[in-house]
Amino acid sequence: LSPTSGDNGNWDLFDVLKKIQSVLDSGDYKFANLSIGPHLPIGDDEVHVWTAVLDQICAKHGILLTVAVGNDGNEDGDAARIQPPSDMVNALAIGAADRSGEKWGRAPYSCIGPGRSPGFVKPDGVIFGGSDDEPFYTYNPLLGSIVGVQGTSYASPLALRTAAGVAALSGTPLNTIALKALLVHHAETSRKYSREHIGWGRFSEDPNVLIDCPNDTATVIYYGSLAKNKYLRAPIPFPDVPFDEAFELTATLCIQTPVDPEHSVNYTRAGMQVTFRPRFGLDDTDTDDFFGQKSQYKTERECRSEGHKWETCLHRSKKFSADTLLSDPVFDIRYHARDSSRHVKGVSAPDMQYAMVISVRVKDFDLYNVIRQRYTILNPIQLRTQISLDT
């Protein structure tokens, strides 16, 4: 910001956007946080220039961008809605939780969703941002001391810190979309708060949580690029030995996509269609829409037919009873593209960067080692050697 930012009615801060654009468009940065933007709620019929410009840059350079959703959550009606550019489809919109420990909730000031469709689930999640009962402590260089503050502006970089921490810990090169998918995949849900308030849930502050597997859980990560009209078959890690417990399947799929700012309804130019085949190992042709419309949208809210197929982030956990038969289950993922709502030929569509995280959990069952023995092709994430220095 400069002393003249916002003068002469320039409340959209276009001069600030140009400076941010010039830095990020250099391609030198893979991680960035924005705790700044126009002070107004998003609208459904028009994409703000901040959102459109930054979405294109993130897709072009593969940047993991976290954006604070704003601090007007106490306002009435649409005035409490998230603020641009946190409605980006290629970034993580971060709200604030009121506590860092248990019994947490949405901080009252944290702006709420929903976003547009596509980009309906906003905020993407929340993380500790401070409250009257538990301030967020940070260093104030002007005072030269630690002060207690609160706001989504502090929550947003904390979420980015977790993702960057995973990249620093991992000797396995994970792309930024995989880091985003891991954050969403391990978000802690709450029955007390709706998705419009906390998104997918509370993000972890500990990067180790995102890459550690408990004994009763097996998690695999698929990531890379996918050509249009091609498909990826992602095997789900499932034991071939009998067990008598209920189990839970959790999956998260994230992509980065070019956007079409002139068409808010058809804003994303790419999408993924996911088909769940629960008994692929038995040559069973039955399929299931695991990431169905109801997994993304509230049933009482109208949404476009098959709109979830154009979302950039899909996430769901589903519990199965002990007598459910699964045999070598897989997800089939197909990439499709459009331009101004029109179909795009395969030769003109760019390759799509994607990441999918899949977890299976069976309580009181040594699932991790069973999966390691069955799928010898799987490689655990290698961790960098850490050296502790005594002070």
Each language-model region and where it sits:
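Short glycine/serine- and small hydrophobic-enriched flexible loop segments
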Residues: 160-171, 185
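C-terminal subdomain of the subtilisin-like protease fold in secreted/lumenal serine endopeptidases
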Residues: 171-248
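Extended low-complexity, serine/threonine- and proline-enriched intrinsically disordered segments
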Residues: 248-307
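Extended, solvent-exposed segments with strong compositional bias
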Residues: 219-223, 281-328, 337-342
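Subtilisin-like peptidase catalytic core
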Residues: 1-46
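C-terminal edge strands of extracellular/lumenal beta-sandwich accessory domains
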Residues: 267-281, 324-391
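Extracellular S/T/G-rich loop segment that most often corresponds to the catalytic His/Ser-adjacent loop
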Residues: 82-164
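Subtilisin-like serine protease catalytic core
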Residues: 1-12, 60-62, 88-90, 114-122, ...
